[in-house]
Amino acid sequence: MKLSRDYFKRSARARLLTAVLSGALVGFSLPPWGWWPLAIIGVAIFFALCNLTEKNREQFALGALFAITWLSLGMMWMWWLTAPGYIIVVLLFSTLHGSAAIVANKIGSTSISRPIAHCLAEVIRFSLPFGGVPLATLPIAISPTRLASTATLGGPILTTWFVLQLAALFTAYFSRRETRSGVLKIAVVLLVIHLVATNVSPVKNTGESLRIAIVQGGGPQGVLAINATARDAVDRHLMVTQTLQLQDNLDAVLWPENVIDVVDFKKSREYSEIVDEAKRLNAEFVVGITEDAGSQRFTNAQVVVQPNGEISSRYDKVRRVPFG
């Protein structure tokens, strides 16, 4: 069996199976694997498959299958948090990409419309429901690369479009669906955006550096709060923190969100312990706390504790959304 373009054009089954494969490639571009080039390759293959059919039902199936494997891999950790939620979220967001595939096939040049349509699907995912679920995204996949510099111009939305458009460029070039001049125009636009983002970015290198210890306390995974005490997480993080030494010359020590769960942080045992560690290491501590805020209410905050005990900065989360 020869896997030629004609074969995929004739075989709907081959297209659907390959859509699953292309989504898996995008999934493996995300942490913990982090093979970022697979994001561009996977999207390019998916776009090429969509170009081989005009049927709305199949366009939807291709988009949904592509997104199901992408998101099911990228958000796999949710299974241990809430298995029903994991299944619902993957299926819900996959329908967005199924719908985007249909819309893109009906509007103008697909080399332009597909990246825009699927970017809009991601915009909806970033926004709804409950303030959005921006997990397993294309910007996360390319974050270790210079391509991520586009985020300084247009945030994750521009970066999402950039990755999708770059993939569409390769699809257009190799499928010869687009004229050579059309491919060149797309390439020039992407190059200009990348150069501007890299060289005219509002984010500047100060030339200074900070030495920061990031503490992850460890412990068994998948333990629900109802099956543990709030103190368990604190003890584990203190144990790891105590392996740090003054000779490490730290500027700051960072603890994760929600490690400390107390009624009033400033009056708590945990505050005193953090101050003691800050004095010992002569470094400020940036710690995540959950603190009571009246009857049946609480707040999530990140606070900065100085070696002298001063809380020099505090940020309270403005809006809670699922998973952060």
Q: PLM features: residue spans?
A:
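Generic, ordered loop/turn and secondary-structure boundary motif
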Residues: 36-41, 136-139, 152-154, 261-264, ...
